[in-house]
Swiss-Prot record:
Disulfide cross-links: none
Modification(s) after translation: Phosphorylated by host CK2. Unphosphorylated protein N seems to have a better affinity for leader viral promoter encapsidation. Phosphorylation of protein N in ribonucleocapsid may stabilize the interaction with protein P, thereby playing an important role in viral transcription/replication.
Molecular function terms, GO-annotated: RNA binding
Transmembrane parts of this sequence: none
Pfam families recorded: Rhabdo_ncap
Miscellaneous remark of the record: Displays a superantigen activity in human and mouse, activating mostly V-beta-8 subtypes of T-cell receptor.
Lineage of origin: Viruses, Riboviria, Orthornavirae, Negarnaviricota, Haploviricotina
Gene encoding the protein: N
Superkingdom assignment: Viruses
Family classification: Belongs to the lyssavirus nucleocapsid protein family.
Species whose genome carries this gene: Mokola virus (MOKV)
Record keywords, A-Z: Capsid protein, Helical capsid protein, Host cytoplasm, Phosphoprotein, Ribonucleoprotein, RNA-binding, Superantigen, Viral nucleoprotein, Virion
Claim: Phosphoprotein is one of the keywords in the record: yes
Listed name of the protein: Nucleoprotein
Positions of post-translational Phosphoserine modification: S389
Main function: Encapsidates the genome in a ratio of one protein N per nine ribonucleotides, protecting it from nucleases. If expressed without protein P it binds non-specifically RNA and therefore can bind it's own mRNA. Interaction with protein P abolishes any non-specific RNA binding, and prevents phosphorylation. The soluble N-P complex encapsidates specifically the genomic RNA, with protein N protecting the genome like a pearl necklace. The encapsidated genomic RNA is termed the nucleocapsid (NC) and serves as template for viral transcription and replication.
């Protein structure tokens, strides 16, 4: 009998078969470039830049844009934005540019052109007679790139927010060094006619390329990033949250991870810190891996590292951070357990509340205050029935360690203390909770104080 088969009976008939499952075509893919080739796309025939400008501008005024033509124009316009590379630019072994070289966004990627003509002749443009200036080209490019940022704003009750963002971005591209090329509210009207720009692979690729360039090169038109900046660390919310977390608690990544007391963290931490990636390399392809098509399913997203994401934001909630209170809970990743651990870590790193003395007249006054607080804490812990007398050394002011926190959790049977619950209620009850947010979770779970 083959070792990979099982045997059982169905209606008294012996059946032998090999269990098989569907192959996962959506496994996490790491963005490291292994073949030494720049990321690339294929577009239609390069247009005459001035003809393309007139056609695209006419289409924008009519709120009717052809995505293929928009992409072709954005790629052709890259050559207008020349700058000087400040340092040798290398990523994953690929030499993008040398220090002092004159470069434009196209040097970052490989854009292949076919002989397929665009729809320029059919798209209009007759209402624009004279050839555009450099400032007008830059403004149109900027407005087109802003469509990506607007399409990334999703959720309930975002209409007014989107309109305000669109208006502010329009204002940027009608003042020097740019030039006004459209009437007020044109950007929002165009967005409404086609709201899914962020799902168009070639458009996303070009937006990421522009952002990678202007993040690296000082340029008079660097304000173009107002529409592209959302491509930086896109689908990286798990890793970004962890980075913010260690800065908040002022520990190294290694020391911070010693506090992660849950078996489900193991796979997530292994996934998040896979060797061979350029997570800490400035201006790497890694920063824009999603836009550049280097990863279909990010191993760094909040869903990929859900337990880590939940814990970090429960600690953030304990610290009163609005961003954490508004973040969306990953419901499938043990939010109740993560809220317990988050309470203990919040107390460890933040204390019992927001208000405490932080500034003193001199070092002696600061030292006296610290000693007084340590004595007060030790006295209160000695009276706490949950603490065994021979375990009290774990709670002294001199001992702030993962071992101490772990012992505290175990002695309380893996449950939050009332001081933790009171803190959670205090920070979440006065916050206008969004649906499925951490604030809503805390309000629902701990509203009765237990």
């Amino acid at each position: 009998m083959e070792s990979d088969k099982i045997v059982f009976k169905v209606n008294n008939q012996v059946v032998s078969l090999k269990p098989e499952v569907i192959s996962d075509q959506y496994e996490y893919k790491y963005p490291a470039i292994l073949d030494g080739k720049k990321p690339g796309i294929t577009l239609g025939k390069a247009p005459d830049l001035n003809t393309a400008y007139k056609s695209i501008l006419s289409g924008m005024k009519a709120a009717k844009l052809d995505p293929d033509d928009v992409c072709s124009y954005l790629a052709a316009a890259m050559h207008l934005f020349e700058g000087v590379c400040p340092e040798d630019w290398v990523s994953y072994g690929i030499v993008i540019a040398k220090k002092g070289e004159k470069i434009n966004p196209s040097v970052i990627v490989d854009i292949v052109r076919t002989n397929v003509e665009g729809n320029w002749a059919q798209a209009g443009g007759t209402d624009v007679i004279r050839d555009p200036t450099m400032a007008e080209h830059a403004s149109l490019v900027g407005l087109l790139l802003c469509l990506y940022r607007l399409s990334k704003i999703v959720g309930q009750n975002t209409a007014n927010y989107k309109t305000n963002v669109a208006d502010r971005m329009e204002q940027i591209f009608e003042t020097a060094p740019f030039a006004k090329v459209v009437e007020h509210h044109t950007l929002m009207t165009t967005h409404k006619m086609c709201a899914n720009w962020s799902t168009i692979p070639n458009f996303r690729f070009l937006v990421g390329t522009y952002d990678m360039f202007f993040a690296r090169v000082e340029h008079i038109y660097s304000a173009l990033r107002v529409g592209t900046v959302v491509t930086a660390y896109e689908d990286c919310s798990g890793l970004v949250s962890f980075t913010g977390f260690i800065k908040q608690i002022n520990l190294s990544p290694r020391d911070a991870l010693l506090y992660f007391f849950h078996k489900n963290f193991e796979g997530e931490i292994k996934r998040m810190f896979e060797p061979g990636q350029e997570t800490a390399v400035p201006h790497s392809y890694f920063i824009h891996f999603r836009a550049l098509g280097l990863s279909g399913k990010s191993p760094y997203s909040s869903n990929a590292v859900g337990h880590t994401f939940n814990l970090i934001h429960f600690v953030g909630c304990y610290m009163g951070q609005i961003r954490s209170l508004n973040a969306t809970v990953i419901q499938t990743c043990a939010p109740h357990e993560m809220s317990v651990l988050g309470g203990y870590l919040g107390e460890e790193f933040f204390g019992k509340g927001t208000f405490e003395r932080r500034f003193f007249r001199d070092e002696k006054e600061m030292q006296d205050y610290t000693e007084l607080e340590e004595a007060r804490v030790e006295a209160s812990l000695a009276d706490d029935g949950t603490v065994d007398s021979d375990e009290e050394d774990f709670f002294s002011g001199e001992t702030r360690s993962p071992e101490a926190v772990y012992s505290r959790i175990m002695m309380n049977n893996g449950k939050l203390k009332k001081v933790h619950i009171r803190r959670y209620i205090a920070v979440s009850s006065n916050h206008q909770a969004r649906p499925n947010s951490f604030a809503e979770f805390l309000n629902k779970v701990y509203a009765d104080g237990s």
